[in-house]
């Protein structure tokens, strides 16, 4: 699907969609129980559908009533080697490898888009020496398929910390279910620590005990059972970051449903925008970011890489030079987001460059627009383009807009409600 985005002024109040990262985790905890759990504030997306399919393959069932999702946990006997369609969701894929080994003795995980090319060697190197059979192939329809067969055993597990925290979270879900005690150690430095904390918070709410013995080292008792824990899903700082950056660029937007008490690493968007010179007003779970005299800054993306593209746009329109550091993991997302961000900004008339794992931006006063952007197949690039267009002299065109369905299907409706123009 192709859309043209036009220069516009955005104004209004928006409720942040439910946190995708939190929803993944709460759904999995609910699916691993034997009871019923209600999650309120739930929002559909392609990634949520992927996690629901995988839980369904393990015997969970779902009922949707408005924004309430009722999950009935694993029922009956689990099929041997269930097939799990992960869509394009990296979280779903990496969470369910150890879960499936633990509760089903293996699985066939189907992957679409670029998901089949995203790194999985951390698990392969961990599980194959422990007797798990591992095979990467291609299905009859051309989709990548990962087949894992075997059983996880209690023991001492060590993971490198300079990889996606999704591998750590996958083990945290599975290890408590094993018939014996285990330890999990993550070697420092650790990527996206906040997402590990979010997983621990979710499993603890479901009655799982995890004992932290040292920094990034946990003792995990076995023979545990997940207990039903209904909750309301918090708003998503990762999605709200797009609107907060729009505020920093001169639009008048208030975002609601954003708790100041959160393990979401992408709350760092507020700190980073203030470092660029924006003003942040926060009260009663409402956030309004106002433009100031934006200036260059060095911003560390180590714990919040997903907000780097929209921050790069904001920094591009600030005075002076900015540097976004530790952006290397952007290369391993739905597209090479580091290269795509630099390409988009330059095509629009900015001055951006990649410097190793950093993005360097030389501020410009105005973006030209007037171009057709490539189809990146990435929801973050769609959001970036839509906000960039509001600050361009000429409209911009982009194909592949349907990629937005992966995380926030209602985004374009929200964008237009705020005054955004696209057709």
PLM regions with names:
Residues 1-423:
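Short, structured segments at the rim of ligand-binding sites
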């Amino acid at each position: 699907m192709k859309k043209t985005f036009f220069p516009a002024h955005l104004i209004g109040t928006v409720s942040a969609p439910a946190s995708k990262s939190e929803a993944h985790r709460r759904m999995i905890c609910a699916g691993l129980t034997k009871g019923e759990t209600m999650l309120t504030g739930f929002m559909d997306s392609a990634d949520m559908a992927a996690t629901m399919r995988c839980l369904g393959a393990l015997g969970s069932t779902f009922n949707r009533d408005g924004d309430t999702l009722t999950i009935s946990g694993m029922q009956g006997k689990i099929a041997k080697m269930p097939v799990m369609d992960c869509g394009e969701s990296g979280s779903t894929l990496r969470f369910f490898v150890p879960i499936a080994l633990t509760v089903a003795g293996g699985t066939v995980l189907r992957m679409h888009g670029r998901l089949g090319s995203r790194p999985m060697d951390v698990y392969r190197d961990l599980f194959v020496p422990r007797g798990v059979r591992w095979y990467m192939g291609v299905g009859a329809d051309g989709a990548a398929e990962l087949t894992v067969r075997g059983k996880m055993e209690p023991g001492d597990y060590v993971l490198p910390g300079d990889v996606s925290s999704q591998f750590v979270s996958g083990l945290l879900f599975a290890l408590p279910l094993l018939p014996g005690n285990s330890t999990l150690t993550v070697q420092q430095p650790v990527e996206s620590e906040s997402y590990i904390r979010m997983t621990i918070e979710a499993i603890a709410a479901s009655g799982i005990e995890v004992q932290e013995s040292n920094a990034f080292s946990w003792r995990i008792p076995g023979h545990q059972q997940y207990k039903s824990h209904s909750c309301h899903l918090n708003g998503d700082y990762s999605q709200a970051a797009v609107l907060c950056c729009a505020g920093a660029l001169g639009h008048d937007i208030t975002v609601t449903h954003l708790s100041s008490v959160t393990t979401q690493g992408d709350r760092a968007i507020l700190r980073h925008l203030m470092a660029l010179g924006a003003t942040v007003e926060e009260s009663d779970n409402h956030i309004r970011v106002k433009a100031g005299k934006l200036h260059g800054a060095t911003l560390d993306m180590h714990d919040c890489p997903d907000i780097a593209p929209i921050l790069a746009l904001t920094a591009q329109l600030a005075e002076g030079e900015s540097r976004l550091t530790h952006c290397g993991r952007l290369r391993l997302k739905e597209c090479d987001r580091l290269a795509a961000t630099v390409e988009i900004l330059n095509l629009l008339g900015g001055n951006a460059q990649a410097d190793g794992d950093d993005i360097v931006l030389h501020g410009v006063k105005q973006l030209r627009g007037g171009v057709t952007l490539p189809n990146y197949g990435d929801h973050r690039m769609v959001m970036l383009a839509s906000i960039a267009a509001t600050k361009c002299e000429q409209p911009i065109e982009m194909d592949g807009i349907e990629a937005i369905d992966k995380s926030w299907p209602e985004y374009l409706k929200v964008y237009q409600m705020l005054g955004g123009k696209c057709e």
